[in-house]
Amino acid sequence: MVKLAFPRELRLLTPAHFTFVFQQPQRAGTPQITILGRLNSLGHPRIGLTVAKKNVKRAHERNRIKRLTRESFRLRQHELPPMDFVVVAKRGIADLDNRELSEALEKLWRRHCRLVRGS
């Protein structure tokens, strides 16, 4: 049975981890959200989130976006390539309801899988 946990090893924790992704990212995005990815040598995917107060004013909205993004990643972690991902929330993401945000994330995860297979 596949474990769908979200342990510490699946998170980008230090600024160096984020910088690694920002240096040479593969991008997949919508007007409200961008997912940057870069292959890692760990054999499993990791995720980091950036939801700026400038783009999403209310804390409960930022928390909702982060919670839904983590859940989407947790459920897809075994299908994703071994990459470090940084999810960047843009202006207007707070206007998406939970279903729309989940669908957008699913679409972007699939796009990243295709990008890796294509290269």
From Swiss-Prot:
GO biological process: tRNA 5'-leader removal
Domain of life: Bacteria
Catalytic activity: Endonucleolytic cleavage of RNA, removing 5'-extranucleotides from tRNA precursor
Cellular component, GO annotation: ribonuclease P complex
Disulfide partners: none
GO molecular function, one term: tRNA binding
RNA-binding recorded as keyword: yes
Known EC number: 3.1.26.5
Keywords for the protein's UniProt record, in alphabetical order: Endonuclease, Hydrolase, Nuclease, RNA-binding, tRNA processing
Record's subunit section: Consists of a catalytic RNA component (M1 or rnpB) and a protein subunit.
Protein family membership: Belongs to the RnpA family.
Function of the protein: RNaseP catalyzes the removal of the 5'-leader sequence from pre-tRNA to produce the mature 5'-terminus. It can also cleave other RNA substrates such as 4.5S RNA. The protein component plays an auxiliary but essential role in vivo by binding to the 5'-leader sequence and broadening the substrate specificity of the ribozyme.
Protein name, per record: Ribonuclease P protein component
Lineage: Bacteria, Pseudomonadati, Pseudomonadota, Gammaproteobacteria, Enterobacterales
